[in-house]
Amino acid sequence: MSGSGASGNKFRMSLALPVGAVMNCADNSGARNLYVLAVKGTGARLNRLPAAAAGDMVMATVKKGKPELRKKVMPAIVIRQSKPWRRRDGVYLYFEDNAGVIVNPKGEMKGSAITGPVAKECADLWPRIASNSGVVV
């Protein structure tokens, strides 16, 4: 069981990707971008769109990419967000794009490599993503 699924707690972050957002796909699975359909594990408030931050699992579809990946709902994890968020040490951090990777429901990646940096909040929470990432910021 070790190494699969989310491990530990995640601090509150600025929510960057509401339902309907499109983000880049940063793995080598063959998908180019991901369309957010739902956010896993969020509470609800009347008339508020669920939104995700780095480290959150979302349900997404592929809008551009390999035909065998398109038109299916699959879980993905957000690894970068362009909206600034505050870390506990007072540093504000943001990336130049929104990006995610396709995973299975247990959190294991479909691809085998991640392009670009990964947020530390995401790498701490998802061990399989941390092991496949090049740079953790």
UniProtKB/Swiss-Prot annotation:
Please give the Pfam families that the UniProt record associates with this protein. Ribosomal_L14
GO terms, biological process = translation
Q: Which UniProt keywords apply?
A: Cytoplasm, Ribonucleoprotein, Ribosomal protein
Main location per UniProt?
cytoplasm
Leader sequence range is none
Where is this chain's protein located in or outside the cell? Cytoplasm
Q: Which GO terms describe its molecular function?
A: large ribosomal subunit rRNA binding; structural constituent of ribosome
Which Gene Ontology cellular component terms are annotated? cytosolic large ribosomal subunit; hyphal cell wall
Role, per record: Component of the ribosome, a large ribonucleoprotein complex responsible for the synthesis of proteins in the cell. The small ribosomal subunit (SSU) binds messenger RNAs (mRNAs) and translates the encoded message by selecting cognate aminoacyl-transfer RNA (tRNA) molecules. The large subunit (LSU) contains the ribosomal catalytic site termed the peptidyl transferase center (PTC), which catalyzes the formation of peptide bonds, thereby polymerizing the amino acids delivered by tRNAs into a polypeptide chain.
Family in the record: Belongs to the universal ribosomal protein uL14 family.
Enumerate the PANTHER family for this protein.
50S/60S RIBOSOMAL PROTEIN L14/L23, LARGE RIBOSOMAL SUBUNIT PROTEIN UL14
Q: How does it assemble?
A: Component of the large ribosomal subunit. Mature ribosomes consist of a small (40S) and a large (60S) subunit. The 40S subunit contains about 32 different proteins and 1 molecule of RNA (18S). The 60S subunit contains 45 different proteins and 3 molecules of RNA (25S, 5.8S and 5S).
In Swiss-Prot or TrEMBL terms, this protein is called Large ribosomal subunit protein uL14
Q: Which species does this protein come from?
A: Candida albicans (strain SC5314 / ATCC MYA-2876)
Q: Which gene encodes it?
A: RPL23A
